[in-house]
C-alpha cells in the first residue's frame, strides 16, 4: 500500500504544471499582441532542448542563440487544427550573463504562441522571438481571458483611426457633451461620449453600436476593449477631426475631453516589439 501511495504521488507531481520561478508577469498589452496574432496557443512541457550550431542558425544575430525544442502538449488552448501530443519548434533567445547561452532545461513548462507549419503536423513556428513565455497559472489565466473575449460573438473591433468629433454646450455653465467617432477595421460604429455637468466629475463612456448609453462606465483596465483603445488611440486628436467652423472654444473643449479619455485609459504598457 505504501509503495502504491508513493507511486501515485509521484505520478501526480509529474503531471502537475511546473511553474517557473517567480518572474514579472507579461503585461496585458504584450500578451494581447501575441494572443491575437497566434493561431496556436498551448501550454507545453519540454522533453528535449538542443542548442543549434551557428551553421544551423542562419540569420540569427550576434548575441542571440537558437534552440530546437521538443515538448509535450499539456493543454491545447487554441488551434485551428488538432496537434499531436508532442510537438517541436525553434526559439531564439538572447545571451545570458557574460554573453553565455541561456539555460533551457528539460521538463520546463511554457506558454507558446505559434502557427502551424504547412506539411509538418508535429511542428509549429513561434509567431515572434518572444512568443515562448515562462509558464504560470496567472499567465495562462490572462491568456485564456484574452482569447475568450476575442472569440466572443461581438469582440471589440480594432481601432484604425479617429473620425469626426462634435461638442455641444449645455444650457447651464459648465455643462456639455462631446462625441468622438472612431474608425474600425470592420466598419462597426464605435464612439466616445464625454459628459460634463456642473459640480460633478466628468464622465465618459464608449459605445460599440449606434446606440449610446450615457450611463455606461469606461472599460475596465486589462480588458480587450481597454486594450483596443489604450493601444490604438493617438496621443492627440487629429486636426481633421475638429469640424470646420468650430469655434476656438469648442475645439479646445473637444481636445480637453479627448485628453480626459486618454488620461483615464492610462498608458498601453506595451514593452515588447511587435512582429
Question: Residue spans of the language-model regions?
Answer:
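Sec-dependent N-terminal signal peptides
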Residues: 3-13
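Transition segments tied to proteolytic processing and entry into folded domains
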Residues: 15-275
